[in-house]
């Protein structure tokens, strides 16, 4: 089946040329291309058109779950008749196993799995193994983490068709081998029930039941039914039932794995004893022996993933299987926000290894645990045959990979221009800034000011407050959740000015901001590099009156690059608007935009056509089922939510952290209501 792009939007601005260039590059086998697209230029729509043109399975890689969810929603809208899947970590909460030698502290693994995401992950792998070409998988960096052998997964697919002869009990055993569990009382995802000649299977990767009806030893009927009403959704002549778990194995493989594990245990214990680590030897022997007993009796144990190398039949040091192994050879990878995503992919292996070294050296795990890991960056590169890097500020790596050839997309369908950039002397910069602030306040617009240090941010805030300017500051010492409120207050008009040290985060993508002031712009460094200055200047790119003022005593190379590039883009945007009679339109950003919305749209009133632009920002809302929890369960859920909130805040994912905060407050209110006092 081919991709079928469904959209009321038409490519405009730079989009047609970008689509043509990228499509040609992929079809000609170019290994790497870079799409340099400014914020709001409709990069997602461009990529959707490229996918439809090349008709290849595609992996869209995003650097966090929130953006992945937004992309998933958008691509579902573009390809409603094709397989658009979502593959991210299925943990709502995850505390990895770790050991801290300095304090002799062992931290046990703790987790909470999101059943819905688990279903979506299975749907993604099932779609890839179905053989269809029209598959788009939107993924986070989870795609490079270890999972089951795709061959084992595929070998456990059950193919049935009407009229085929198969004994019912044999069929039931096949279901059990595919890790479906029989439950005739309560049917949940991954279960099946038997009523006479009818077998109902709650597919692990779907919201529907599969009903298989037998007539003796012959399959008489196959149909998908609604699990609640029992109404038939669709009949089938043939059907493939995919396994209920990504990690498949056989009894023979399990016995072989146990034998190999016990052999390696003997060697590692002997090694510890030879270097005088009797305590570590004893600890390792007891832990692994207990795990083997659990696997023999129950088929699994806590931390079984640390033995994955044995179950997969891999040699020591070889890479694990991952989502990329489920794709055919001729697939395309699109790396969104590549300047962030590529370094993240590069860092995953090192972080995982650093944690596991202590577990191995102190006798908590066998050395084979090191092979349950994400891909090394070199391994990822070897599997990525064709890549499109997408970024407003591509890094040197992407430019080198694409041999300096960049496909530009700088025209916005809204007609908005890149902001005007002015350089002013740092002498009397605060007085000059005060004048500019007053001009914006009169127009009910907002201002961002970026400084080099926390102390400067605080002192400038105090000065502006003393001059009756409504303002606040954010930096790493400000409570992370308080930052969310401060930014929301800026949008609401509680503050007119927000001052910070690093204002590059997506949480500060604010259309109300018409002025960005960069103090000490000539101080070269991380916060004043070319890419940082470009990203900072981009904060004003969503406002019709967008302007950037750099206060400096000299123009550095980074400043010159940023100014020249912005002016070049602006000239191109102006020329396009004049040629096509387009008037720039201010973006109206919804305050509670759901990630499952299908984007924003703009209408060219002069021509009556619509064009697609990216939504201004994603926003995930948690919706847990807590009404019927016991007090203990609710307390545990609150603690997990608190940890998730703190983790999101540490990553400066402000919107996500705010949602967890709201969820936590609701649970606290529920706790007080159900158990007062």
Swiss-Prot record:
SMART domains: DEXDc, HELICc. Keywords: ATP-binding, Cytoplasm, DNA damage, DNA excision, DNA repair, Excision nuclease, Nucleotide-binding, SOS response. Gene3D superfamilies: P-loop containing nucleotide triphosphate hydrolases (3.40.50.300), UVR domain (4.10.860.10). The beta-hairpin motif is involved in DNA binding. Forms a heterotetramer with UvrA during the search for lesions. Interacts with UvrC in an incision complex. Belongs to the UvrB family. This is UvrABC system protein B. It comes from Bacteroides fragilis (strain YCH46). The gene is uvrB.
């Amino acid at each position: 089946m081919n991709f079928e792009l469904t959209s009321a939007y038409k490519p405009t601005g730079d989009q047609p040329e970008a689509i043509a260039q990228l499509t040609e590059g992929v079809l000609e086998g170019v290994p790497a291309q870079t799409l340099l697209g400014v914020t709001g230029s409709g990069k997602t729509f461009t990529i959707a058109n490229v996918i439809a043109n090349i008709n290849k399975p595609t992996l869209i890689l995003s650097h966090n779950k929130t953006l992945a969810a937004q992309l998933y929603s958008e691509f579902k809208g573009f390809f409603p008749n094709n397989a658009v899947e979502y593959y991210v970590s299925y943990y709502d909460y995850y505390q990895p196993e770790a050991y801290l030698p300095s304090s002799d502290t062992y931290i046990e693994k703790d987790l909470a799995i999101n059943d819905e995401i688990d279903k979506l992950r299975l749907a993604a792998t099932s779609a890839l193994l179905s053989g269809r070409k029209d598959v788009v998988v939107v993924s986070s960096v989870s795609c490079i983490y270890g999972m089951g052998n795709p061959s084992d997964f595929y070998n456990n697919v059950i193919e049935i068709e009407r009229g085929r002869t198969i004994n019912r009990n044999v069929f039931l055993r096949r279901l059990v081998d595919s890790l479906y569990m029989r439950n005739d009382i309560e049917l949940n995802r991954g279960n099946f029930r038997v009523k006479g000649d009818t077998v109902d299977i709650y597919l692990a990767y779907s919201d529907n039941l599969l009903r298989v009806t037998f007539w003796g030893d012959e399959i008489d009927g196959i149909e998908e039914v609604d699990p609640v009403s029992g109404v038939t959704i669709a009949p089938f002549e043939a059907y493939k039932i995919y396994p209920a778990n990504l990690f498949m194995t056989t009894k023979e493989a399990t016995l072989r794995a146990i034998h190999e594990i016990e052999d390696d245990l003997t060697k590692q214990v002997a090694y510890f004893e030879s270097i005088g680590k009797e305590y570590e030897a004893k600890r390792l022997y007891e832990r692994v022996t207990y795990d083997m007993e659990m696997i023999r009796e129950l088929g699994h144990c806590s931390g079984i993933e640390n033995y994955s190398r044995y179950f997969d039949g891999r040699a020591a040091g070889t890479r694990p299987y991952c989502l990329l192994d489920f794709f055919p050879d001729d697939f395309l990878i699109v790396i969104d926000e590549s300047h962030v995503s590529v370094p993240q992919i590069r860092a995953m292996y090192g972080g995982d290894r650093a944690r596991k070294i202590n577990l191995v050296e102190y006798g908590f795990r066998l050395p084979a645990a090191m092979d349950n890991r994400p891909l090394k960056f070199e391994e990822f590169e070897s599997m990525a045959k064709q890549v499109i890097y997408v970024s407003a500020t591509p890094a040197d790596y992407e430019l080198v990979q694409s041999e300096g050839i960049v496909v530009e997309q700088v025209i916005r369908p809204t007609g908005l221009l890149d902001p005007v950039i002015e350089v002013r002397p740092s002498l009397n910069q605060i007085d000059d800034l005060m004048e500019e602030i007053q001009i914006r306040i009169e127009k009910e617009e907002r201002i961002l000011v970026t400084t080099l240090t926390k102390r400067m941010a605080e002192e400038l805030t105090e000065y502006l407050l003393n001059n009756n300017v409504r303002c606040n500051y954010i930096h790493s010492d400000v409570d992370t959740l308080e930052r969310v409120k401060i930014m929301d207050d800026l949008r609401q008009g509680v503050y007119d000015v927000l001052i910070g040290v690093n204002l590059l985060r997506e949480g500060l993508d604010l259309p109300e901001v018409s002025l960005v002031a960069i103090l000490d712009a000539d101080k070269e460094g991380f916060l004043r590099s070319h890419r940082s200055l470009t990203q900072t200047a981009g904060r004003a790119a969503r406002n019709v009156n967008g302007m950037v003022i750099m206060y400096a005593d000299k123009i550095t190379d980074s400043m010159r690059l940023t100014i020249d590039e912005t002016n070049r883009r602006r000239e191109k945007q102006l020329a396009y608007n004049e040629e096509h009679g387009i008037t720039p339109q201010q973006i109206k950003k919804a305050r509670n935009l759901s990630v499952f919305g299908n984007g924003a749209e703009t209408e060219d009133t002069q021509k009556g056509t619509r064009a697609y632009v990216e939504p201004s920002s994603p926003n995930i809302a948690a919706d847990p089922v807590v009404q019927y929890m016991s007090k203990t369960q609710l307390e545990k859920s609150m603690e997990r939510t608190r940890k998730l909130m703190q983790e999101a805040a540490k990553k400066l994912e402000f919107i996500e952290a705010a949602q967890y905060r709201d969820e936590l407050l609701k649970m606290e209110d529920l706790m007080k209501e159900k158990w007062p006092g």
